[in-house]
Amino acid sequence: MSTAALVEGKIVQCIGAVIDVEFPRESMPKIYDALILEGSELTLEVQQQLGDGVVRTICLGASDGLRRGVVVKNTGNPISVPVGKPTLGRIMDVLGRPIDEAGPIESENKRSIHQKAPAFDELSPSTELLETGIKVIDLICPFAKGGKVGLFGGAGVGKTVNMMELINNIAKEHGGYSVFAGVGERTREGNDFYHEMKDSNVLDKVALVYGQMNEPPGNRLRVALTGLTMAEHFRDEGLDVLFFVDNIYRFTLAGTEVSALLGRMPSAVGYQPTLAEEMGKLQERITSTKKGSITSVQAVYVPADDLTDPSPATTFGHLDATVVLSRDIASLGIYPAVDPLDSTSRQIDPNVIGEEHYSITRRVQQTLQRYKELRDIIAILGMDELSPEDKLSVARARKIQRFLSQPFHVAEVFTGSPGKYVPLKETIRGFKMIVDGECDHLPEQAFYMVGTIDEAFEKAKKIQ
């Protein structure tokens, strides 16, 4: 604590989550200083200096019962949270306080949630692939170790289930540490995730930070930074860490709420004028350095399925791979509902993934694109009017479409079918056989919800 720790101020105005505090003019708190209420655990974070000793703060917690004249103390430092191994296996809130009723977190290390992004010469780009065991992702939009991935989708198309499956497949195989930041999502999902980790015996390798949708906007805005600070610490210790965020859109939305409360003019669609800067500050810190790596998977809600909305559009530019979930594909009953024509990855390069993988990916996309173009003709004139080549393309595309589906481990409870982990070699072999015409004699139902291509052959025997 600095010498300013003794400085006291008084609340002069309360408007929802925004609190104005008056300090002596010669000792005003700095921007991002943490203020604490006397006799309470409530923390305020300084956002603006209004002049005449008055600062405007955002409340990290419920502001019920606050009134003018209440004494506030300046800690003289930004919000700091515990980092390191003591955080593993624990659930924490935005201030790093435990909320799992398992006693205090005995961490000697504390770190400010506001850190500078690593300098350009410290960064370390990676081309090593990270196998996920999910066919459509490994084939169409492969992940890089130490890269950033976004799961884009509207309401109810399966972002959280996809993320849970990725955590299930990567975190368990990975063996390193993971940090999960629940930003403005359902408390039920946070609870389910905790028990999922506990049941699979990987809880001692995961730090969980929650600021759920029932919490004030200040908590939801800062909880992503809290989780990121913990992940950065592991990275700076020379470790490879996984960082999961569900959901980045809620971070933006909390920023919008705070911005409006602070009296800033809204910009496009009512978002905060500082949207790009806030997103950039967060995303530039999620990066891999020469010391260690952060591999990040972020769910991004797409309002009204509009990918051009400022929030998802701002996120796109920061990512190495984008997995776009489509309502049209979900309506066909194909899960994961990943759109193979909309999803992209910087790893799709023959020099990175190899010539065979690259050519199979492109042939699969060409076949699906041809089917998309022919759909209108089929709807009006029927299949009989197509040329033999086009009929073959359509048949193969429908098989590819169904083969891109896969039963998930985390959805076993709902589907009743056991989850499948498909190695990358098997994925490439399966799709190669389909585009090469080796499966033309099989019915398309045989490809639905199977793992490897061998399972499709077995299923075909049962059907026939």
From Swiss-Prot:
GO molecular function annotation: ATP binding; ATP hydrolysis activity; proton-transporting ATP synthase activity, rotational mechanism
Family stated for the protein in its record: Belongs to the ATPase alpha/beta chains family.
Predominant location: membrane
A Pfam family per the record: ATP-synt_ab
Keyword tags: ATP synthesis, ATP-binding, Cell inner membrane, Cell membrane, CF(1), Hydrogen ion transport, Ion transport, Membrane, Nucleotide-binding, Translocase, Transport
EC number: 7.1.2.2
Domain of life: Bacteria
Assembly and oligomerization: F-type ATPases have 2 components, CF(1) - the catalytic core - and CF(0) - the membrane proton channel. CF(1) has five subunits: alpha(3), beta(3), gamma(1), delta(1), epsilon(1). CF(0) has three main subunits: a(1), b(2) and c(9-12). The alpha and beta chains form an alternating ring which encloses part of the gamma chain. CF(1) is attached to CF(0) by a central stalk formed by the gamma and epsilon chains, while a peripheral stalk is formed by the delta and b chains.
UniProt cross-references to NCBIfam families, sorted A to Z: atpD
Annotated residues for binding of ATP: 153-160
Record's keyword annotation contains Translocase: yes
Places the protein is found: Cell inner membrane
GO cellular component: plasma membrane; proton-transporting ATP synthase complex
Gene: atpD1
Reaction catalyzed: ATP + H2O + 4 H(+)(in) = ADP + phosphate + 5 H(+)(out)
SMART domains linked: AAA
Organism field: Burkholderia thailandensis (strain ATCC 700388 / DSM 13276 / CCUG 48851 / CIP 106301 / E264)
Record protein name field: ATP synthase subunit beta 1
UniProt-listed PANTHER family: ATP SYNTHASE (PTHR15184), ATP SYNTHASE SUBUNIT BETA, MITOCHONDRIAL (PTHR15184:SF71)
Gene3D superfamilies in alphabetical order: 2.40.10.170, Bovine Mitochondrial F1-atpase, Atp Synthase Beta Chain, Chain D, domain 3, P-loop containing nucleotide triphosphate hydrolases
InterPro entries assigned: AAA+_ATPase (IPR003593), ATP-synt_VA_C (IPR055190), ATP_synth_F1_bsu (IPR005722), ATPase_a/bsu_AS (IPR020003), ATPase_alpha/beta_chains (IPR050053), ATPase_F1/V1/A1_a/bsu_N (IPR004100), ATPase_F1/V1/A1_a/bsu_N_sf (IPR036121), ATPase_F1/V1/A1_a/bsu_nucl-bd (IPR000194)
